[in-house]
From Swiss-Prot:
Keyword Nucleotidyltransferase part of the UniProt annotation: yes
Keyword set, alphabetical order: Isoprene biosynthesis, Nucleotidyltransferase, Transferase
Function (record text): Catalyzes the formation of 4-diphosphocytidyl-2-C-methyl-D-erythritol from CTP and 2-C-methyl-D-erythritol 4-phosphate (MEP).
Organism (species): Haemophilus influenzae (strain ATCC 51907 / DSM 11121 / KW20 / Rd)
Keyword Nucleotidyltransferase carried by entry: yes
Matching InterPro entries: IspD, IspD/TarI, IspD/TarI_cytidylyltransf_bact, ISPD_synthase_CS, Nucleotide-diphossugar_trans
NCBIfam families per UniProt: ispD
GO-annotated biological processes: isopentenyl diphosphate biosynthetic process, methylerythritol 4-phosphate pathway
One term of GO molecular function: 2-C-methyl-D-erythritol 4-phosphate cytidylyltransferase activity
Protein name per the record: 2-C-methyl-D-erythritol 4-phosphate cytidylyltransferase
Family to which the UniProt record says this protein belongs: Belongs to the IspD/TarI cytidylyltransferase family. IspD subfamily.
Pathway: Isoprenoid biosynthesis; isopentenyl diphosphate biosynthesis via DXP pathway; isopentenyl diphosphate from 1-deoxy-D-xylulose 5-phosphate: step 2/6
Site positions for Transition state stabilizer: R17, K24
Reactions that this protein is recorded to catalyse: 2-C-methyl-D-erythritol 4-phosphate + CTP + H(+) = 4-CDP-2-C-methyl-D-erythritol + diphosphate
C-alpha cells in the first residue's frame, strides 16, 4: 500500500521573543502572513494530500485567512507536543506518514521535502544542518564551562518525517511521562528509535526574533525568482 503524506503544522504558539503585537505566524511579509507562506509550500507540493493546522482555541486571526480546502483545522494544545498530537489524532488514513513543520519556517524548498520522502525506514528522518559555530556550555552565571566538540552536532530543523502511528504513540507516551519534548524527534528518540539526519539548508530558517524577518523576506524573494 502506498504511503499517504500528510502535513501537520503546529501554529498555536504566541512567539513572545518576537516582541510583536500578534503571534509571529501572523506577521506579514511580501503581502502574506508567515503562516500563509509556509502553507503555500506544502499546498504546492504534489505528494502532500492534506494539511492539518493546529491553532489556539481563541485564535482571532485564523478566520481572516482564506484557507484552501486541503487544510483542516484542529485545536492546539498548551505545548507544541500537544498540538502535534492533536493533529495526529485527526488522521484516519492507513499507512500515513506525517511531515511536521514549523508554521514560522516559510522558506522551505521542495527539494528538501524530496530528500525526506526518500527515507522509507520507519525510524523516520528530520532535516538538520551540521553545527558550524563553536559551541560553549555555560553555567548558571553565564560563564563558559567548556567548549563542546561540534564534530557530531547537528541543528535540528523541520520538516520532521515519521509514520503517523509511531509518532502518535511516542508523543502520547512522552507527554504522559512529563518528558521534555522540544521536537518530534526527541519523542521518537525516547521511544527507542534513531531517526535519520537529512542535510538541509541554512536558509530554511525559523523566524524567532525581529531581525529574522528581513532575512526571511530576502530568502522568500530570492526563491520566487
Amino acid at each position: 500500500m502506498a504511503r499517504s503524506i500528510i502535513a501537520v503544522l503546529p501554529a498555536a504558539g504566541v512567539g513572545s521573543r518576537m516582541q510583536a503585537d500578534k503571534p509571529k505566524q501572523y506577521l506579514t511579509l511580501l503581502g502574506k502572513t508567515l503562516l500563509e507562506h509556509t502553507l503555500d509550500v506544502m499546498l504546492s507540493y504534489p505528494a502532500v494530500s492534506k494539511i492539518i493546522l493546529a491553532v489556539s482555541k481563541d485564535d482571532p486571526y485564523i478566520s481572516t485567512l482564506s484557507l484552501d480546502p486541503k487544510i483542516q483545522l484542529v485545536e492546539g494544545g498548551t505545548t507544541r507536543a500537544e498540538s502535534v498530537l492533536n493533529g495526529l489524532n485527526a488522521i484516519a488514513e492507513k499507512n500515513a506518514w506525517v511531515l511536521v513543520h514549523d508554521a514560522a519556517r516559510p522558506c522551505l524548498q521542495h527539494a528538501d521535502i524530496d530528500k525526506l520522502l526518500a527515507i522509507e525506514d520507519k525510524q523516520g528522518a528530520i532535516l538538520a544542518i551540521p553545527v558550524t559555530d563553536t559551541i560553549k556550555r555555560a553555567d548558571n552565571q553565564q560563564c563558559i564551562v567548556k567548549t563542546e566538540d561540534r564534530s557530531q552536532l547537528w541543528q535540528a530543523m523541520t520538516p520532521q518525517f515519521f509514520p503517523v502511528d509511531i509518532l502518535r504513540d511516542a508523543l502520547s507516551t512522552g507527554i504522559q511521562q512529563g518528558a521534555n519534548i522540544t521536537d518530534e524527534a526527541s519523542a521518537i528518540e525516547l521511544a527507542g528509535f534513531r531517526p535519520h539526519l537529512v542535510a538541509g539548508r541554512s536558509d530554511n530558517l525559523k523566524v524567532t526574533r525581529p531581525e529574522d524577518l528581513a532575512l526571511a523576506e530576502f530568502y522568500l524573494t530570492r526563491n520566487k525568482l
